[in-house]
A protein has these predicted regions:
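Structural recognition of alpha->loop->beta junctions
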Residues: 275-300, 350-360
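Extracytoplasmic/periplasmic/luminal assembly and interaction segments
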Residues: 258-280
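C-terminal functional module detector
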Residues: 2-6, 23-33, 45, 51-55, ...
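Bacterial N-terminal signal peptides
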Residues: 8-19
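Short low-complexity, flexible loop/linker segments enriched in glycine and/or proline
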Residues: 80-84, 136-137, 271-275, 279, ...
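Short, surface-exposed, charge-dense and proline/glycine-enriched linear segments
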Residues: 156-161, 287-299, 361-365, 407-412, ...
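A metal-dependent hydrolase metal-coordination microenvironment
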Residues: 26-259, 266-267, 286-288, 295-316, ...
Length: 491
């Protein structure tokens, strides 16, 4: 009798869960695919076009979602000891901070009202940290990691920008409590200086004045009100300065993405200075709680190859070692239409939206319901559909999780938005392993049953083409044989 009750209870649970999932699937069928452009610069930093010109160009090419990511700051400085922050040379270029964040946000608000059919989301690109080695006199002065870039989305308040914890931002009280004890080492000689000054004996007034001046300069140089805990003369600091920025973005309700992980221009000469930013795909697994990274951009990328850094992060998420996965986007590094032969629209990210609104776009971005493409501003590869199904019709979209008692069924359709037949080779990746290669011409429609899916553990499926012009985000799946092998169910 007890076994019968357990069987009926288990069956009811299956029915109830299936009912909910099918209902949710019907809701998901109403997703709207909308291409957007990320990583755009305007004349408010180092771009050639105004924000309004960017909107007009994008609309004319079929894009109505724009992320404006001007530089928060473009600055670098080098100081000489003992007061490196006072005796320094600093070079700074136009940015959000030099133009004022208020002006940047007001301009986006004005253009958004003028073009209500376009969603414009403000943000920035930041260089969180850099450090120096070498010597100006030995002609080997080198700045490291300056080109490690983080894209920030959805910053709506001027203070969001004012308080970004990078090396050159405004004064902040965030770390004052932690830094204030360090001032004591300079307070002691300051007090001694006043004592010497009061004695008025021999060289004591002169020594007292020197101590006072030195101590005051040392306190200013130490600066317990600085925006970041780090300084550019302390050498390599690992992932910590970047994690500091990521944590800050999360606290402010923004989204953040690693950008240009393997750019080839990170090692170069800038006047008499060496710039040294080697490829840094390792930051994907070194850092935590970021939203994602640039999976397609105008340079080299290997982190998306099967079994590489992205898959390492996704597998850590599947094993419960990470709180969140990392999503891929396309980023443009767009400054001027036609520069280096590239135009606005070469790197679209297509979002699957519940509603065409700013809220809908940010929700899709945060949850990974999007895919990345590379094209020519008018034509690009399109992922018309990509789902994993259970046998009973339940399905999951990119960024979602499916639990099924049957072998997962992967279905996808790839085409080009000009509808022309184009040769394509698609890679289906499960858990970091290439499990099948599909060759043909677009439109290409595929159904594949994964009979080798690992039972009892979470994994994921993702797609990419061999040209790296199309990359999906993952769909997570747990395949469980429990239902089929339950000893209480009748044969």
């Amino acid at each position: 009798m007890g076994n019968i009750i357990r069987v009926f209870g288990f069956a009811a649970l299956i029915f109830f869960t299936t009912h909910l999932c099918v209902a949710d699937s019907n809701q998901q069928d109403r997703y709207e695919a909308a291409p957007g452009l990320i990583d755009l610069r305007s004349t408010l930093s180092d771009g050639a076009h105004t924000i309004e010109e960017l909107v007009q160009m994008a609309r004319s090419r079929g894009f109505k979602i724009l992320f404006i990511n001007d530089h928060d700051r473009i600055a670098i400085s080098y100081g000489v000891p003992p007061f490196r922050k006072i005796l320094r040379y600093k070079k700074e270029f136009p940015s959000i901070m030099t133009n004022r964040p208020e002006k940047f946000l007001e301009e986006i608000s004005r253009i958004s009202e003028k073009y209500p059919d376009v969603i414009i989301i403000p943000g920035c690109e930041t260089s969180a940290y850099y450090y120096w080695t070498g010597s100006w006199f030995k002609k080997d002065l080198t700045v490291h990691e300056y080109d490690r870039k983080i894209l920030i989305m959805n910053f709506d308040n001027p203070d969001d920008y004012n308080l970004i914890p990078n090396l050159h931002n405004k004064l902040s009280f965030k770390y004052t409590k932690k830094l204030l004890p360090g001032v004591i080492i300079f307070i002691v000689p300051l007090i001694i200086g006043f004592i010497f000054l009061k004695w008025q004996w021999g060289f004591s007034p002169f020594m007292g004045m020197l101590l006072i001046i030195f101590s005051i300069l040392a306190i200013i140089n130490y600066n317990p009100f600085r925006s970041s805990l780090f300084n550019p003369y302390a050498g390599h600091q690992g992932i910590a300065p970047y994690q500091e920025v990521i944590d800050y973005v999360n606290q402010r309700g923004g989204l953040c993405f690693w950008n240009y992980l393997e750019q080839m221009s990170g090692i170069r000469k800038y006047g008499p200075i060496n710039v040294n930013t080697p490829p840094y795909p390792q930051v994907l697994y070194q850092s935590r709680n970021y939203t994602g990274f640039a999976a397609i951009y105008g340079d080299n990328i290997t982190a998306t190859d099967p079994g590489k850094e992205w898959d390492r992060v996704l597998n850590e998420y599947c094993r419960g070692e990470r709180a969140r996965p990392a999503w891929g986007i396309s980023t443009a590094d767009f400054h001027e239409d036609g520069r280096a032969g590239e135009k606005l629209g070469y790197y679209p990210t297509t979002f699957l939206l519940k509603e065409f609104s700013r809220k809908g776009v940010l929700e899709a971005m945060e949850k990974g319901r999007m895919y990345c493409s590379r094209g020519d501003s008018r034509v690009w590869p399109r992922l018309d559909s990509f789902n994993v199904f259970g046998k009973d019709g339940r399905k999951a979209f990119m960024g979602e999780t499916l639990t099924t008692s049957h072998f997962p069924i992967i279905k996808f359709k790839v085409s080009y938005n000009n509808e022309k037949q184009t040769p394509a080779t698609l890679l289906l990746i499960r858990g970091g392993m290439l499990i099948h290669t599909f060759k043909g011409e677009t439109p290409m429609e595929v159904e594949y049953v994964d009979r080798a899916a690992p039972p009892g553990e979470m994994t994921y499926y993702r797609l990419m083409d061999t040209r790296k012009h199309l990359t999906s985000n993952p769909i997570f799946v747990t395949y469980s044989e429990t239902f089929e092998k339950c000893p209480l169910l009748p044969d």
